A protein has these predicted regions:
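RNA-binding accessory domains that recognize and position tRNA/RNA substrates
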Residues: 1-152, 164-212
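ATP-dependent adenylate-handling ligase core
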Residues: 180-321
Length: 627
């Protein structure tokens, strides 16, 4: 079920929330006082006068949303769907409540954030007065510099680096680069890269703006997805642009990452990042222009390019060596001080493929990646404590498998397989039919690049592979043995669970199912809708001397799925456990995989973790509880 939170921001007593919502989960976010839990520092280069009131409100709203996003976790990745979403209700003091209470502005704000993070949002604004000497996000100063043409988001990754070079060196423009640094080493990396750019381009003197916004004394467990960081980032950039009288913000991101089609098709909601998705960019633009009565344009000039094509721009311009200082990892918090990149996340894998395709490996010295999924054992990586939950195998194999599948698709098949395209085509500023054609061409080029890179890597390392010097469960070992073309059972199981967890609780929200047959029928409908090809109660399966029918089985008859539904008065948990124990050995002794899906509508299982672990100690057995 979706968890509801009320977030009281500076000066709003949480008790006011509890008076109306006795069962509410509350969170207090404070920027001031001895118990503050959010730090907002001044921007590193002092170039701004006071922000206008509406801009200050926007930056504060974005800051509170970002802090709440970090502090309120979604739960584990086994809880995808309604349980993955959060119902976030903010009470925020603002200088200009008339602007934020405007129905259209408020609706656009909620729509923008809801699409970005796949959560529910509500905002309640209270009038506040600006206090004398109050700390501002933007510091004051009178530094003189050549007036910028645009404000560019600058994360320090390959795309934003190339965007900066594209504007400064190729187009002879003068962008102001703005960054957000939540951690000291992020600041250091960005500054190091800026220093390298200035050494190559000494005439570029426009200040680099760094905003420091982060949690103070954060809890050990934080929400890692950080979808709302993009809203904070764009809010900062828009406020800077407004102060300087600029109406253009550049967001340089290659189209493959911006669109971010799911590596596995059943990924849902907040599991797929939308931080620079065309629809999100247009939603933010519409929201901002309505609130400020402005004409801001947010542009992504790299949307129709792959990352390898972006690197070719940098290479052709003569600045390829700068990639050594760039940083692309999406798991910065868990990479070590010895390596800039984790090597496991999709961003790291895509970066490596692009660098290989552009033949720029010499600018990535040994140690750039903490884990080398290409030649290291993927199970070995997953066994390390820090990387245990990264799904290294699923991510790496899924990346290559997705390229194989997309490369074979006709335009019609591509659209059918990835209906997410419909979210992007209306927002590219060109006719939708042309937009689809260009996105299809982009994805085909990306797939062909990935496959060419792995063709080359396997050929280059064939001796090491055949002699066992490269583990068979490394990505190269798996690709060489065509393992990426076969069904990855753990990934297959998680896909099924995502589908069920996303929808079963919603189906039975008003009226619980009467029996297991009703649950099975609902599941069958979901499988058909999401194109999961399963057989329902396949005719009697013979194992040894016994025969029985599973609820569902895959076409290869290697995965058997059974639904269990404990419910009062007679279908008790003990009976469910007995039935599962009777089936487990029958499956495992015959080298089959078993997935038991327990729909616990009445929450009769008190210790879900132990319940699952008691069965999953057997090989090839998966147990998932959906509530």
């Amino acid at each position: 079920m979706t968890a509801t939170y009320w977030i009281s921001c500076d000066g709003i007593p949480p008790e006011l929330v509890l008076l109306k919502h006795e069962d509410a989960k509350t969170l207090s976010i404070k920027r001031y006082g001895p118990d503050k839990n959010l730090f907002v520092g001044s921007i590193g280069i002092q170039i701004f006068e006071n922000l206008d009131a509406i801009s200050e409100d926007l930056v504060n709203i974005a800051t509170y949303v970002y802090a709440a996003d970090r502090l309120i976790t979604r739960g584990t990745e086994k809880n995808i769907g309604p349980g993955w979403k959060r119902d976030l209700n903010f009470i925020i003091p603002v200088l200009e409540p008339r602007v934020w209470d405007n129905k259209k502005v408020n609706t656009l704000l909620k729509d923008t954030l809801s699409f970005l993070s796949d959560d529910f949002y509500n905002f309640h604004f209270i009038k506040r007065e600006r206090e004398e000497g109050e700390s501002q996000v933007f510091a004051f100063g009178e530094e003189v510099f050549k007036h910028p043409d645009s404000v560019n988001l600058f994360s320090g990754g390959i795309d934003s680096l190339t965007g900066a070079i594209n504007d400064i060196a190729i187009s002879n423009k003068n962008p102001l680069l703005i960054s957000h640094w939540p951690m000291p080493y992020t600041k250091t990396r960005q500054q190091r890269l800026i220093k390298s750019i200035r050494q190559k381009l000494p005439d570029y003197k426009t200040p680099h703006v760094q905003a420091r916004i982060h949690l103070k004394n954060p809890p050990e467990r934080q929400e890692y997805t950080q979808r709302s960081r993009s809203f904070l980032y764009l809010s900062l950039a828009s406020a800077v642009a407004r102060q300087l009288g600029i109406n253009r913000v550049h967001v340089y991101e290659n189209g493959v990452i911006a669109l971010n089609l799911p590596i596995w098709k059943q990924s849902v909601g907040g599991m797929d990042t939308r931080t620079v998705h065309p629809k999100y960019i247009k939603l933010f633009e519409s929201f901002y222009n309505e609130a400020f009565n402005a004409d801001l344009k947010i542009l992504n000039p790299f949307f129709l390019k792959t990352r390898a094509e972006v690197l070719e721009i940098l290479k052709s311009a003569g600045y390829a060596e700068l990639i050594e200082e760039s940083h692309s990892c999406s798991r910065t918090r868990v990479s070590s001080k010895f390596a800039q990149h984790c090597g496991v996340c999709s961003q790291c894998i895509d970066r490596r493929v692009a660098v290989e395709a552009a033949n720029l490996q010499r600018y990535e010295p040994k140690g750039t990646y903490e884990n080398d999924v290409f030649i290291e054992s993927l199970s070995g990586i997953e066994s390390k404590k820090t990387w245990r939950k990264t799904k290294a195998r699923a991510m790496a194999v899924g990346y290559v498998k997705s390229a194989v599948e997309i490369a074979k698709l006709s335009p019609e098949e591509f659209l059918s397989s990835y209906p997410e395209i419909y979210d992007a085509t209306p927002y590219l500023g060109i006719p939708e039919e042309e937009a689809f054609s260009r996105i299809y061409d982009l994805q085909i080029r990306q797939s062909e690049t990935v496959l060419k890179v792995f063709d080359s890597l396997v050929k280059k390392n064939v001796k090491k592979i055949t002699r066992g010097a490269i583990p068979k469960d490394s990505l190269l070992g798996i690709v060489a043995a065509q393992g990426h073309l076969t069904e990855d059972i753990p990934l297959y199981v998680e896909n099924i669970i995502r589908i069920l967890t996303n929808s079963l609780p919603t189906i039975f929200q008003k009226e619980p199912p009467k029996n297991e047959s009703v649950v099975q029928a609902a599941a069958e409908g979901l499988f058909k809708t999401t194109r999961v090809d399963l057989d329902r109660e396949f005719p009697q399966l013979a194992f040894a001397t016994r025969g029985f029918k599973a609820d569902f089985t895959n076409k290869a008859h290697t995965v058997f799925i059974e639904f269990k539904y404990p419910h009062p008065p007679n279908r008790k948990v003990a009976q469910i456990i007995k039935e599962m124990n009777e089936k487990i050995l029958l499956y495992t002794d015959n080298e089959a995989y078993a997935l038991f899906v327990v729909y616990d509508h009445y929450k009769m299982i008190s210790d879900r973790k132990t319940f699952c672990e008691d069965f999953e100690k057997y090989d090839r057995v998966f147990v998932r509880i959906i509530v």
